[in-house]
Amino acid sequence: MSDATSMAEDFASGRSDPVQALEQALDSASRSASVFISLTAERARREAEAAAARWRAGQPLSAFDGVPLAWKDLFDMAGSITTAGAAYRRHAPAASLDASCVGLLCRAGMVSVGKTNLSELAYSGLGLNPHFGTPRNPYGTDQPRIPGGSSSGSAVAVAAGIVPIAMGTDTAGSIRIPAALNGLVGYRSSSRRYSRDGVFPLAHTLDSLGPLTRSVRDALAIDDLLHDRRQRHVARSVKGQRLVLEHGVLAEVDPAVRNNLLRAVEQLKAAGARVETRESPTFQATLALIKRHGWLGAFEAFALHQPLLDSADAEQLDPRVRRRLEAARSLPASQLIHVLDVRQRLQQQLIDELDGAILLTPTVAHVAPVLAPLEADDELFVSTNLATLRLTMPGSLLDMPGVSLPSGRDAQGLPTGLLLSAPTGEDARLLRAALSVESVLNN
């Protein structure tokens, strides 16, 4: 499938139209097991028909008028139940209003195909869901492999060509991880960049939103639409772009992940980028803080879900999710206060350390693991989840916007990813840099 920008260009030229694009998406979605929790076909057809009429009249609402997209089932859509991937919410009241982001993209003319699957309550980086099924990674041709999570269905919906864009959320890596494992672009915004009104939360300090796409230009276009901007972006030369390659973690990642990243670095250097290879003291200190004092998201997720854990509905939770939530029940408040205090200092330290550069790391240390052993073995699930989240958690803790880009494949054809990150609030600069980096890697 082409990206959303190319699809919209076809609408403008008359080579295709939104109704045709939607029907293809609905057909593919209906034949893709466990990718969607629900389809919003009636709404989508109304939106597509209206968009097609606007294109015929030469009056599109935006460059993406009529482009189909999917929403992780944490976003409220009026008339639909927001399940959060949890069995106990199957019969929750339907949302009365669209989430703020849903409304903005709807007013730009985009067509909402449905709501995608996810790890229950968005609380795993692997994407397994025993209630609604686990979406299969499209690259797992030898045997079923994990999609990555928690935005599992959103990633697979794009990677499998059902839709060109799907919205996700990211608290510890939930956009960036599935993007890397499915060969996509995944953009985690700074937590305050978009309104989270109408989005089911996990950890208020760390939750962020963003798209999974097939190109950086599509991610930039979504960012513009969510800020009610209309502009066209052209990749600038990467010459002079400063990057810091975090060397300290490279020994810990799979050879294919490391080799593909280093190959990308050589391409960028050849194109004129200034790449400094060294350990990042702030990144390493953040890894150490998480290891020693625990994950801020664990404190906040327990506080949010304690009423659920203390209710009869807790019996309906995936036991693995329930155990992970319960593990934070006994954590002392002093530990939380310490993490928050150090976090603030590290955020300022990062700004000073990078001094305008972009941090470059692997997104995930490995390619997508085989699914069956993780379904069968609780200990393997826990250790693999921690390993999968390890390299994205520091960026989340420091609220760093991040863009995961495809960096290549391993010998089996499984995707690897690299991660570009910047200090909190520097999303626009990061996205421009990602567009330039992508243009080099694609050539």
Where in the sequence are the language-model features?
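Acyltransferase
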Residues: 15-23, 49, 99, 256-279, ...
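An N-terminal boundary/leader segment
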Residues: 1-46, 53-56, 266-272, 443
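Structural helix-boundary/capping segments
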Residues: 107, 160, 164-251, 262-271, ...
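Short helix-loop capping/hinge segments that flank enzyme active sites or metal/cofactor-binding pockets
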Residues: 65-87, 240, 295-347, 404-414
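Residue-level signal for inorganic ion chemistry
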Residues: 25, 44, 219, 243, ...
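Short glycine/serine-rich loop/turn segments
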Residues: 64-206, 246-248, 361-380
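Immediate post-signal peptide segment of exported/extracytoplasmic ligand-binding proteins
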Residues: 51-68, 235-243
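Serine-dependent amide/ester hydrolase catalytic core
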Residues: 8-12, 24, 303-397
